Structures are given as structure tokens and as C-alpha cells.
């Protein structure tokens, strides 16, 4: 039952029907209070609606119920927290993303699906690293090694996205060549 509620809530969230998504998530939590995924989804929807206290409570409950799971919960908690606590949440999320990226690199299966998963994880990891770097520019700017940490994190994030940009440019050039090859010649 709660799986159906969460699936419907995800569809509502994707179509920006936040009121219905929130109602469905609350129903899922009420039906299954020990379901970490239901609490995580409730937290995500609450963030979208601006209910920050309820979001934090739901996300914390999700983490209490199971430490395993997606990095999103930790990244959201990093956004909601301040200073060192924010850093701890973000670092946990980044650790999960690193593990997921490594697993995607060594996984077997459908090539396009694996590439899509790896790409999505790599982009999320780069964003997470930038979020931590931003902390060292703001809340943690007075830490002794803030500048070095910020620089290292930003550099790591750039190293992750550079190959992605090269692949994008290569695909664009291939599409352009293909278009030119199939374009009929016209006389002027």
C-alpha cells in the first residue's frame, strides 16, 4: 500500500502537485511509520513546500530507521543544518555518492543504463563537493584549513565534470557531422 502511495506521491511531486504529494506522503507515513523511504519522501516534499521543520524531522527519522539508502537524505539534511553539523551531513552524502559511483563503474548490465546511472551519480557528487566547498566559504570560513579544503573540493568537483563536458562536446560534434552529411545539397 505505502509503495503505491509513494509512487503516486512521486508522480504528483514531478508534476508539481505539491499539496497532493504532501497528503500522500503523510498517508504513507501513517500507514507505515517504520518505512524509512516514506519518511525520506515526506521530507523531500516538505522541503518543496517550505515546511522546513517537518522536513528535518522526517529526514532525521528516515536516517534513524536505516543508515543505508540514498545520499539525498543526507544532502537535504546538510542544507537544513548549519556549520559543522551541515558538514557532517554533506560528507555522509558524498561518501554514499562516491560508493555509488564506484559501484556503477564496476557494474555489469545494459551499457546505456549504466552510463546514465554513472553520469547522474557523478553530477550529484560534483554538486555535493561544491556544497561542502561553499560551507568553507561561509559557515566554516574561520577553520584553520578552510581555504585549502575549499580549493581541494572545488578542484575535485572540476575534475569530475571536465570529462563530462568533453563527452558532451564530442556528441554535439558527431550530431553536427551527421546532420551535415544528411543535409541535401542546394544550389544558390
Q: Residue locations for each model-derived region?
A:
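Start-of-helix register in tetratricopeptide repeats
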Residues: 3, 37, 72, 120, ...
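"A position-specific structural signal for the A-helix of alpha-solenoid helical repeats
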Residues: 7-8, 41, 76, 124, ...
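Canonical positions in the second alpha-helix
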Residues: 27-28, 61-62, 93, 157
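Short coil turns that delineate tetratricopeptide repeat
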Residues: 33, 67-68, 98, 162-163
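Acidic, Ser/Thr- and Gly/Pro-rich intrinsically disordered linkers and low-complexity segments
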Residues: 100-122
Amino acid at each position: 500500500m505505502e509503495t503505491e502511495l509513494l509512487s503516486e506521491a512521486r508522480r504528483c511531486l514531478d508534476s508539481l502537485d505539491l499539496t497532493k504529494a504532501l497528503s500522500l506522503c503523510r498517508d504513507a507515513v501513517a500507514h507505515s511509520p517504520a518505512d524509512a523511504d516514506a519518511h525520506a519522501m515526506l521530507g523531500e516534499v516538505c522541503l518543496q513546500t517550505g515546511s522546513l521543520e517537518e522536513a528535518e524531522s522526517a529526514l532525521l527519522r528516515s536516517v534513524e530507521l536505516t543508515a543505508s539508502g540514498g545520499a539525498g537524505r543526507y544532502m537535504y539534511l546538510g542544507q537544513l543544518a548549519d556549520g559543522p553539523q551541515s558538514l557532517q551531513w554533506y560528507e555522509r552524502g558524498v561518501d554514499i555518492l562516491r560508493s555509488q559511483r564506484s559501484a556503477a563503474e564496476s557494474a555489469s548490465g545494459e551499457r546505456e543504463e549504466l552510463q546514465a546511472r554513472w553520469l547522474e551519480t557523478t553530477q550529484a557528487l560534483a554538486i555535493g563537493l561544491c556544497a561542502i566547498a561553499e560551507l568553507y566559504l561561509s559557515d566554516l570560513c574561520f577553520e584553520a584549513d578552510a581555504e585549502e579544503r575549499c580549493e581541494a573540493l572545488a578542484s575535485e568537483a572540476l575534475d569530475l565534470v571536465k570529462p563530462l563536458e568533453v563527452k558532451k562536446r564530442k556528441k554535439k560534434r558527431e550530431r553536427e557531422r551527421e546532420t551535415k552529411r544528411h543535409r541535401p545539397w542546394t544550389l544558390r
